[in-house]
Amino acid sequence: MDCETFEINGIYELDRGEQDKHYDFWWNLPQDYMVSSEWGLPPQFENGVVPGDLVGGKYGHKIHFWDLRARKNIQTIDLGENYQMALEIRPAHDPTKSYGFCGAVADNTNLQGAVFTWWRDDDGKWQAKKTIAIDPRPEDPDNLPEIIKGFGAVPVLVTDIDLSLDDKYLYVACWGIGEMQQYDVSDPFNPVLTGKVQLGGIAKETKHPN
């Protein structure tokens, strides 16, 4: 897009690499990189989540690293097919830092929610590892939707994450269990849970806190 006229000049991606889905993206201008995440293809969300695709690991589970100016995908990291819907990308606000976080909505093997820390290592390669795992909440199967009755638990469903401007706290929205959790991420590789607030959740019969 032209920054003066807002006319569309064309697509950004000159070389997508492995990318075939898209969701969120953030960039770091001084370091000339961009990070993007994945959700799903239009048929996978236009009429709601497709249970078979969710169980089959067909939603997004990769994060992509780009050369910002060259508009080229330079590296892709697969978080694992079980980590479905790798959505929100949250980099450190300090532009001299080369790390950030990505939230995964659900682990389709156990209904956990997860947050990954990603970073650039000393060799210039991007890495990622799971640094937060949030357990599902046990529940009477009669109170659960059909797709998760067999688990006997409410999925966490990490639908959003946000990093405080001082890069100290990460806030994790656990939509399924109805919690907002706060983590001290002063050490981004070892987050520490410091607080949480209950706001409702599946099977709680509580109004959605919009």
Predicted regions and their residues:
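Short, conserved, GDST-rich strand-edge loop motifs in beta-rich repeat architectures
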Residues: S37-K58, C102-F116
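Structural core positions within WD40/WD-like beta-propeller blades
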Residues: V35, Y99-F101, Y171
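Signature of short aromatic-glycine-proline-rich micro-motifs recurring in repeat-based ectodomains
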Residues: H22-D24, M85-R90, C102, I147-L163, ...
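Surface-exposed loop and turn segments in beta-propeller and other repeat-based domains
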Residues: I8-D20, N73-Q84, Q127-A153, T194-N210
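Repetitive beta-architecture junctions, highlighting loop-to-beta-strand starts
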Residues: E7, Y59-I63, S98, L111-G113, ...
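Short coil/turn segments that connect the beta-strands within blades of beta-propeller domains
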Residues: P30-D32, T96-S98, D166-K168
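Aromatic- and glycine-enriched pocket-lining scaffold segments that form the walls
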Residues: M1-L41, H64
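Short loop/turn segments immediately following beta-strands, especially the blade-tip
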Residues: C3-F6, F65-R71, F116-T131, Q182-T194
